[in-house]
A protein has these predicted regions:
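A short SAM/SAH-binding and catalytic strip from SAM-dependent methyltransferases
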Residues: 51-65
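A short acidic, Gly/Pro-enriched loop at the edge of an enzyme's catalytic core
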Residues: 41-53
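A short hydrophobic/small-residue beta-strand
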Residues: 7, 81-82
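Class I SAM-dependent methyltransferase SAM/SAH-binding core
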Residues: 1-42
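A short glycine-rich, Lys/Arg-flanked "PGG" loop and its adjoining helix->strand segment in the class I
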Residues: 65-80
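Short, glycine-/aromatic-enriched active-site segment of Class I SAM-dependent methyltransferases
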Residues: 86-105
Length: 193
């Protein structure tokens, strides 16, 4: 609603694209918003086609460095990338949380190192900021917790489903305990000419 630009959303799951299209129609935006069910590892864009790539909370699926490198080709000269990425907020931290994240996402790193990796991938860093705590608790973990009973019911309370739920609950506990050491950081970079 706040831009006149054309937006192409991607998601691996066709159901999410269907939902996007329904919402775009509902809001009168279907002439500017389209969706494609595709993997971010196989994007269907032409070199230099896009002004902006904005993988909100998802670049970790293929890795920060790989995403920056591979997606750069799709940006026009001076095009922008805007990514949110889990990052260390301190240079030192308790072993327990370091081990947890190194096991779950080995590319976690400090903000300064993430910015350096952005530069090495051919971008000029424009800005970065730490997302507020409510983004984790209210926008991510709360809906996740609310859906746990339905998830367990859907998968008949199977052992694998229970284990997955426990991993998610452990992650929530780790965040509450160690949120001063890590968070999601929003990085904005401009493709170098």
């Amino acid at each position: 609603e706040n831009t006149k630009g054309q937006i192409t959303a991607i998601d691996l799951f066709p159901k999410m694209i269907t939902l996007l299209k329904e919402r775009a129609i509902h809001h009168g935006l279907s002439d500017r918003i389209s969706g494609i069910a595709v993997s971010m590892e196989n994007l269907p864009f032409e070199p230099g086609e896009l002004d902006l790539i904005w993988p909100e909370g998802s670049i970790y699926n293929i890795g920060f460095e790989r995403g920056l490198r591979e997606w750069k080709q799709f940006l026009k000269p001076g095009g922008m990338i805007a990514v949110s990425e889990v990052s260390w907020l301190t240079n030192t931290r308790p072993d327990e949380i370091e081990q947890f994240w190194n096991f779950n996402y080995a590319e976690i790193d400090t903000i300064s190192n993430k910015i350096k990796k952005m530069e090495e991938a051919g971008y000029t860093p424009v800005a970065h900021f730490i997302l507020p705590e409510y983004c984790w608790l209210d926008c991510f973990y709360k809906p996740m917790q609310e859906n746990i009973p339905l998830f367990l019911e859907k998968y008949k309370n199977s052992k694998p489903a229970q284990q997955l739920v426990q991993r998610e609950l452990d992650e929530i506990d780790y965040y509450r305990k160690y949120k001063s050491y890590y968070g999601y950081v929003f990085y904005i970079g401009m493709k170098n000419e």
